[in-house]
C-alpha cells in the first residue's frame, strides 16, 4: 500500500512481444500468431504478436528468443529491444485477460511488455519453418484488430524502423533480394 496515493502497488506481470517484420520482395508483412478462445459462450478467432509472459529464471532477451521459437519455430533471429508498453489499459479487454489466464493457468492483473523487433527477408526456408505453427505473415495494410495493444506495438515498431533506417540505411539491404528493383526499394 502506497501511503501517499492510498492505492495498492501494482502486481505486474512482465511479458515480451516480438514484432517480426518481413519483406517478400513486394510488401512488408508482420508475423502474427492465430489465437482462438471463448468469451461468454462465444468462440472467437483473432491474431496477436508472438509473445508471452517471462519465467522467473530467464533474462528478457532469452525470453524473447524462447517465445519466438516456441510460437513460430524461428531460431537465432536477431531481435532488438525497442520499447516498453505499460499502459494501465493494456488489459482492459476481459477477453484478452481471460484468454491469457487460461493459457497461463494463473491470475493476471497488469502486464508490462517489453517489445522486440526484427527485420527479416521472407524466403522459402523461413516459410518452411513456419509450416507447423499457428503463425502467418500478414501484409501491413491487411492487419485487423489484434489482441491486447498489439496494433499500437506494430505502429510504434514501424515508426522506430523509419527512424532507425534514417541513420542506418544499409540495414534496408538485408531485406532485399540480391538483385532488386528501384520499386522494391521504394516499397521499403
For each feature predicted by the language model, list its residue ranges.
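N-terminal strand-loop-strand
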Residues: 6-47
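Active-site segment of metal-dependent pyrophosphate-handling enzymes
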Residues: 14-16, 62-65, 69-124, 164-172
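Short, His- and charge-rich active-site/binding loops that engage polyanionic ligands
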Residues: 30, 34-40, 44-46, 79, ...
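A eukaryotic nuclear recognition-module signature that targets compact all-alpha binding cores
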Residues: 40-47, 159-171, 182
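Short histidine-centered catalytic/ligand-binding loop motif
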Residues: 49-57, 174-175
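NUDIX/MutT-family hydrolases
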Residues: 111-122, 126-163, 175-187
